[in-house]
Amino acid sequence: MEPLKSHTGKAAVLNRINVDTDQIIPKQFLKRIERTGYGRFAFFDWRYDANGEPNPEFELNQPVYQGASILIAGENFGCGSSREHAPWALDDYGFKIIIAPSFADIFHQNCFKNGMLPIRMPYDNWKQLVGQYENQSLQMTVDLENQLIHDSEGNQISFEVDPHWKEMLINGYDEISLTLLLEDEIKQFESQRSSWLQA
């Protein structure tokens, strides 16, 4: 995965609560085994009308949000069934960072595991960001190393992130590459196993 130390991009607001994984990526698109190409299916039932045309009423279809890479979402984002396809779809759509008051736990972890940064934001700070960015085409900088958001008005908002996931994102590690970093320690441990444990 690519390291994520700091990111500057346009922020889009999807101020809906309880957006579940079936709304993020509908179940009929889960048959593919590749991790790429899911972006065109993200929010499919909201993005397109019955004729397959873009729905002009859907928030993320608004011209001001085109090219957004930061999503300001509502409470309990990513709830519902566990599917890793949900962060795949959001990442392929172009989002690198998701800011919300709360996330479903499994979705929250899946974002980190797939190189995305989900930020749990206290409600008052989140509401402030929604007020700034709703229906606007504005940039935001998210500094993961210093755990700071620099908003469009020059304010700094701090955020919390688990040290383990922070290290993973900053260094671009996935679970396999992190395991390979410990290869020598693993070999040493295995060499010290009691003989009766050997197959």
Swiss-Prot record:
It is an enzyme of class 4 (lyase). It catalyses: (2R,3S)-3-isopropylmalate = (2S)-2-isopropylmalate. GO terms for molecular function: 3-isopropylmalate dehydratase activity. Belongs to the LeuD family. LeuD type 1 subfamily. It comes from the Bacteria. The keyword DNA-binding does not apply. This is 3-isopropylmalate dehydratase small subunit. Pfam families: Aconitase_C (PF00694). Catalyzes the isomerization between 2-isopropylmalate and 3-isopropylmalate, via the formation of 2-isopropylmaleate. GO terms for cellular component: 3-isopropylmalate dehydratase complex.
